[in-house]
Amino acid sequence: MKYCKKSFFLVALLFTSLPSFPADFGIVKGSDNQVIELVRMNNLLPEYTRQAVRYGIEGSVKVQFNVDTFGAVLDPFVVESNPPGLFERASIKAVRKLIYQPPVFEDQAVNVESVQVDIVFKLQ
């Protein structure tokens, strides 16, 4: 019986602690700072760390990366993290799995630079 209670608690916790992604924009490489919107083909969410769940910690991470002409994420890195040291690894891992619709500008497939996503970790 104890096992069932723990399983239910874990499932309930997973549904109440999902991070969220806002819309994504980036700069067309080689353009005069032309900004375009990127369309996600998937929306993989990072895992909320056990330590953060255990202690009720919420936070956010800003990740920057480039997107190639096929829609793949390149070179993600953390720009800002609050609190530092807790959510960065999960955020980078999730961002690497994102796939975008191949970006097009003026009927040409383009590379997009300086895409930033803010990932918010919030317990509900």
Regions found by a protein language model. Give the residues of each.
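Bacterial N-terminal signal peptides that target proteins for export
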Residues: M1-F9
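N-terminal signal peptide c-region/cleavage motif recognized by signal peptidases
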Residues: T16-S20
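Boundary of Sec targeting at the N-terminus
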Residues: A23-D24
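Short proline/glycine- and basic residue-enriched helix-capping loop/turn segments at helix->loop/beta transitions
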Residues: K29-Q64, S91-Q124
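Short, acidic, Ser/Thr-enriched surface-loop or helix-capping motifs
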Residues: V67-D68, V73, V104
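A short acidic/small-residue loop/turn micro-motif
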Residues: E80-L86
